[in-house]
Amino acid sequence: FRSVEHFQNIREETDGFTPFEKLEYLGNMTLDFLFEHYAVSKISVLTDMQSPKENDNTYRTYAAYLPLVAACRPDLDEAAIRRKTLYLITVMQQMFLRYEVISQTLGIDLRQKENRRNFHIQVLHDILEV
């Protein structure tokens, strides 16, 4: 998942995308990975929440998303960009960890890839206000 070739392919696949489209693509890829590797991903996310470390998976995800959030909203100051990136990562983790409750509450099955994609796009619009 984290191989150099894989990230090079992502760069090539997203070449010409807008910053929002890149963020959407990366988010969908992240969510798909979490759901497709449920057990290990759940342990990883919960470990990051329980014992945060400077370079844990949540931090690395935040670092990867930060420049894309900034590119989507160049009008915002750095503090606002950092907050919005934090909101996005937190919501994505909750979408994953609490998918059953969220699915019941909102009436959408987040185990279904298309439903996840649509919900993720809505979350991006809500958080980024674009």
Language-model-detected regions and their locations in the chain:
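Hydrophobic alpha-helical connector segments
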Residues: R2-E36, T85-L88
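Amphipathic, well-ordered alpha-helical segments in soluble domains
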Residues: S3, E36-V40, T61-L68, R98
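Amphipathic alpha-helical packing segments from all-alpha helical-bundle domains
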Residues: E21, Y25, I43-P74, R82, ...
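Amphipathic alpha-helical segments used for helix-helix packing
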Residues: L31-K53, Y99-Q104
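Alpha-helix N-cap/helix-initiation sites
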Residues: H37-Y38, E78-R82
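Hydrophobic, amphipathic alpha-helical faces that serve as interaction scaffolds
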Residues: V40, K84-Y87, Q93-L97
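C-terminal peripheral helix-coil segments that are non-catalytic and often amphipathic
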Residues: L66-E78, V91-V130
